[in-house]
Amino acid sequence: MKLLEDRIHSDGQVLGQDILKVDRFLTHQVDYQLMKEIGKRFAQVYADAEVTKVVTIEASGIAPALYAAESLNVPMIFAKKAKNVTMNDDLLITEVYSFTKKLTSTVQISSKLIEEGDKVLIIDDFLANGQAALGLVHLMEQAKAEVVGLGMVIEKSFQDGRQKLLDQGMKLTSIARIEKFEDGKVIFAPADDIAFD
């Protein structure tokens, strides 16, 4: 999506060899208009997939997932990283490693929210090593739900997450794909949604 690539160029900041800071529009401050366009794009790509639920992981995946769910007219559920006192029923639980935070979190979703046979679209903010996405896929497998696709706002294609998901037979759509960082600049690979631009 050219709109997202332009925003990454103008407001993204490359940190070191493998980190992109996008806190001006996605990971801290949220540009709701951009997120709405991204959500609409995911809905276009998966319009024929009969999605019944959109699932993400807190926190930065929530905005694009919510707008995708709105466009698809289905509920959005986010996996929580911390259990609270109201989550006292059966839980779907898995471990997820965060590349950026360098820590492993236990994530959970109430089993009452995902039904056997649900057709789930998983949305997340970044795809790096694929651990968050694979963790969400594992939660959906526990619920006997079908993952019909994965939508990533930004993919770091120079890391192995994409290949891990494709090796699992997943349909993957990344709105912006980063081929590499060069001299502090982002070099893009062709995005998966290019037919919609």
From Swiss-Prot:
Write out the entry's keywords from A to Z: Cytoplasm, Glycosyltransferase, Purine salvage, Transferase
Q: Which locations, inside or outside the cell, does it occupy?
A: Cytoplasm
Query: Carries keyword Zinc?
Result: no
* Binding-site residues for 5-phospho-alpha-D-ribose 1-diphosphate, renumbered to this chain: A128, N129, G130, Q131, A132
Q: Enzyme group, top EC level?
A: transferase
What job does the chain carry out? Converts the preformed base xanthine, a product of nucleic acid breakdown, to xanthosine 5'-monophosphate (XMP), so it can be reused for RNA or DNA synthesis.
What is its quaternary makeup? Homodimer.
Designated name of the protein: Xanthine phosphoribosyltransferase
Organism, scientific name: Lactococcus lactis subsp. cremoris (strain SK11)
* Taxonomic classification: Bacteria, Bacillati, Bacillota, Bacilli, Lactobacillales
